[in-house]
Design a protein with these regions (language model features):
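Polar/acidic, low-complexity leader/linker segments enriched in S/T/G and N/D
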Residues: 1-64, 182-192, 199
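A broad, low-specificity signal for short, low-complexity segments enriched in glycine/proline
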Residues: 53-67, 89-95, 120-121
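Short, flexible beta-strand-to-coil junctions
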Residues: 36-42, 76-79, 132-138
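Extracellular-facing segments of soluble proteins and assemblies that are Gly/Ser/Thr-biased and enriched
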Residues: 84-88
Length: 200
């Protein structure tokens, strides 16, 4: 099996009132909560994440990244399997399961990318939360394999959760859930160029 970068997006919405309350209650920091990932459910990219694979990876992520306050994520789709500290915008501070939904609490950082993320939220922009990992997929035999459904394999490794502008799953706004595969598309190139200009 050939491992590739897998990116799965869920919409993440938060009201202006909730943003203001969060900033007030958290000493000026924006802290948001919602769905980070969903197990055993086909996303808009046609991928299904088996619960046992996500349980294992989330457990490792909690024990290392979250507990050590290094569960950093980036703003937009990175083209790398590592988190670039120059682009860090937020830190996942807590995660837990509610059935097949992985819920989490995310602190927006006071970094250049974090400040952009905070202003996007304050302006009412809908963003997606995106899981990033390395792994392989295998076709699932639904409708004779014609629908393109694939299942993420046990070699999956969770890398990070990133905020993105193009959620590919219904409800992936840190309340609902969404996902997508990392492909070099014209949309990704345009977003990368715009972000490069914004970051200077």
């Amino acid at each position: 099996m050939n491992k590739k970068l897998l990116v799965d997006v869920r919409p993440f919405e938060i009201s202006r009132q909730k943003i203001d309350e969060s900033i007030k209650e958290n000493n000026g920091k924006l802290v948001v909560k919602g769905v980070l990932q969903r197990a055993e459910s086909k996303n808009q990219n046609g991928r299904i994440y088996p619960r046992e694979v996500l349980l294992r990876e989330v457990g490792k992520y909690l024990d290392t990244n979250v507990q050590e306050r290094r569960a950093l994520g980036e703003l937009d789709h990175p083209e790398s399997s590592v988190v670039n500290l120059n682009n860090a915008s937020h830190n996942v501070v807590e995660m837990h399961w509610d059935g097949d939904d992985l819920l989490g609490t995310v602190e927006v950082l006071s970094t250049p990318a974090g400040n952009i993320l905070k202003e996007l939220f304050k302006s009412g922009i809908k963003l997606g939360i995106s899981s990033r990992g390395l792994g392989s997929v295998e076709p699932v035999n639904e409708k004779n394999g014609e629908d393109g459904t694939v299942e993420v394999q046990p070699d999956f490794e969770l890398i990070a959760f990133d905020f993105v502008s193009n959620p590919s799953t219904h409800g992936a706004f840190m309340r609902p859930v969404n996902e997508s595969v990392q492909n070099k598309t014209p949309e990704n190139n345009i977003e990368r160029i715009i972000n490069s200009i914004m970051r200077g």
